[in-house]
Amino acid sequence: MQKIIVFILCCFMTFFLYACSSKFENVNPLGRSFGEFEDTDPLKLGLEPTFPTNQEIPSLISGADLVPITPITPPLTRTSNSANNNAANGINPRFKDEAFNDVLIFENRPAVSDFLTILGPSGAALTVWALAQGNWIWGYTLIDSKGFGDARVWQLLLYPNDFAMIKNAKTNTCLNAYGNGIVHYPCDASNHAQMWKLIPMSNTAVQIKNLGNGKCIQAPITNLYGDFHKVFKIFTVECAKKDNFDQQWFLTTPPFTAKPLYRQGEVR
């Protein structure tokens, strides 16, 4: 009888812990900025990235008609009063009293990187296609996105322990995990869905893992030597534990306007 009671209690505790963890996994990816706490799709985009408009020549669009109007500025944040939560001691909690915490994830001000491109082995560069905040992030090859300019350029806001927020040079918005993909949204240093861990790989690439959902950025590769002139969907998926191509990202020089190596008429 005693064993049965213990078994029932164990089952109850397992169910309780699972229910609690599931509740906090299925929360609003925009944090306190827009929508209800448990709304996993506040922008009503769906959970899968939908392909951009089929354009003969890829070009930037406004995209204001694709998403609802959302606050331009992030919600107010504060620093923690706890001596145990600071830049040296780690990450402040995401939740407080079954709501989002309003404290900064890290107490310190971030260092800011130089401008860079985030480029996958397939040639897919993380790119803002629709300028209005809340639109999906896509992967474009550099040659097919020449007209996008700084929408393909990023800066890292660098925090301790290889964490960073990733800010677009054109829109000044940050990468925000959303559903199974990524949107760009006003930078909010209290939102765990905007904080990314850079995990070094042996070939100088990095995996980019989201703090909020624990998943890594992926651009699926179907043909490593043939995936040219295509638009890549960008996902967040379970982080690969073994060798892979589609979760590798190189932080490399930005594609600002380059001068030609030779002028017309010069000997080559």
From Swiss-Prot:
UniProt-recorded Gene Ontology molecular function terms: carbohydrate binding; toxin activity
Enumerate the spans annotated as Ricin B-type lectin domain: 112-252
Keywords (A to Z) from UniProt: Cell outer membrane, Lectin, Lipoprotein, Membrane, Palmitate, Signal, Toxin, Virulence
Residues covalently joined to lipid (S-diacylglycerol cysteine): 20
Q: Where is this region: Mediates binding to target cells?
A: 129-140
The superkingdom listed in its UniProt entry is Bacteria
N-palmitoyl cysteine-type lipidated residues:
20
Summarize the protein's role: CDTs are cytotoxins which induce cell distension, growth arrest in G2/M phase, nucleus swelling, and chromatin fragmentation in HeLa cells.
User: How does the annotation summarize its subunit structure?
Assistant: Heterotrimer of 3 subunits, CdtA, CdtB and CdtC.
Name of the protein in question: Cytolethal distending toxin subunit A
